[in-house]
């Protein structure tokens, strides 16, 4: 169905699903291309459609990346998520709810939909810039929402600050993890009663060797109090504390993601290690949670634990 957008001097400009699909492309020529009959009609319009499409494309995709960097990037699918959300925000209020993102039955594609029509797709492995044989753990609805929110912020940063792709990838990550909305969303899901700036609690070693060995599986096989709990969430419900681990794809996006094509094998290796921790935790969750609760209660109801004033047991660094 046609969707009404509002931007610039072109109030209430109506586009169909096909045109919206074209506008998701960063390729300006493809996005604003008009067929022969469309061009004839445009000749008689007071408000030229070709100009409106150019303006709209610039609003969504910026002015391009400028000079290409030394390394090729794989950002089409993650930027498409941002472009789709940008279109949704430009739609009139009555039409914004028509824009939805769903996962397909195979859990490998995000379907970008307007009404009941799929206008485009984003492959989750291309979004993450990982190899085709990499494993993606299934996500809950809440995890998918957070995942897409992070994708939107990454896409926004790369669209409007293309210079970030010329700098160290850590600069891009800091822009994302430092985003106030992302911090709020991550903590609301993982540690709703704890603020991102919650002060650390000094480590009190009360664990046996066996307990430390059991906890090693949630930290790449190591036990180190200052980093052990950086992926662990917790919240109290009716006096009981429940623990969880951040989904590996979310951890990866926040702390390991690189858009450079040549980094695909490295990216896949990072995700594989995160998957291993995630699966090991859930395989031994009954036993691990008992130890976590013991530490939680003896450290002021927090796992933001440190030693000598130093800690990385926060969700976002």
From Swiss-Prot:
GO terms for cellular component: extracellular region; host cell cytosol; host cell membrane; host cell plasma membrane; membrane. Keywords: Host cell membrane, Host cytoplasm, Host membrane, Membrane, Secreted, Virulence. InterPro entries: SopD. Coiled coil: none annotated. Pfam families: SopD. Transmembrane segments: none annotated. One of its GO terms (biological process) is protein secretion by the type III secretion system. Disruption phenotype: Deletion of this gene impairs bacterial replication in mouse macrophages but not in human epithelial cells. It is found in: Secreted; Host cytoplasm; Host cell membrane. Belongs to the SopD family. Effector proteins function to alter host cell physiology and promote bacterial survival in host tissues. Contributes to replication in macrophages. Plays a role, cooperatively with SopB, in membrane fission and macropinosome formation during invasion. NCBIfam families: PRK15379.1 (NF011906). This is Secreted effector protein SopD. It comes from Salmonella typhimurium (strain LT2 / SGSC1412 / ATCC 700720).
């Amino acid at each position: 169905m046609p969707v009404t957008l509002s931007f610039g001097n072109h109030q209430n400009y109506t586009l169909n699903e096909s045109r919206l699909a074209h506008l998701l492309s960063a390729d300006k020529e493809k996005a604003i291309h008009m067929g022969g009959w469309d061009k004839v009609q445009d000749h008689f319009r007071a408000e030229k459609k070709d100009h409106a499409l150019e303006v709209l494309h610039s609003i969504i995709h910026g002015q391009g990346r400028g000079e290409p960097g030394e390394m090729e990037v794989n950002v089409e699918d993650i930027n498409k998520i941002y472009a789709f959300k940008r279109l949704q925000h430009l739609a009139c209020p009555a039409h914004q709810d028509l824009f939805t993102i769903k996962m397909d039955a195979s859990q490998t594609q995000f379907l970008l939909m307007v009404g009941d029509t799929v206008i485009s797709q984003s492959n989750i492995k291309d979004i993450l810039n990982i190899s085709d044989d990499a494993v993606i753990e299934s996500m809950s609805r809440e995890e998918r929402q957070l995942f897409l929110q992070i994708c939107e912020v990454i896409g926004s940063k790369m669209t409007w600050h293309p210079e970030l792709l010329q700098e160290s990838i850590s600069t891009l990550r800091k822009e994302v993890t430092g985003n106030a909305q992302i911090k709020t969303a991550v903590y609301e899901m993982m540690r709703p009663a704890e603020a991102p700036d919650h002060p650390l609690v000094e480590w009190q070693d009360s664990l046996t060797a066996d307990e430390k060995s059991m906890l090693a599986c949630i930290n790449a096989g190591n036990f180190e109090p200052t980093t052990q709990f950086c992926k662990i969430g917790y919240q109290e419900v009716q006096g009981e504390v429940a623990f969880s681990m951040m989904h590996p794809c979310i951890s990866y996006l926040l702390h390991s993601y690189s858009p450079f094509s040549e980094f695909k094998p490295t990216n896949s290796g990072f995700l594989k290690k995160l998957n291993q921790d995630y699966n090991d935790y859930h395989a031994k969750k009954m036993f691990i949670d008992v130890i976590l609760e013991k530490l939680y209660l003896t450290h002021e109801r927090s796992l933001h634990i440190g030693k000598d004033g130093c800690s990385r047991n926060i969700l976002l660094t």
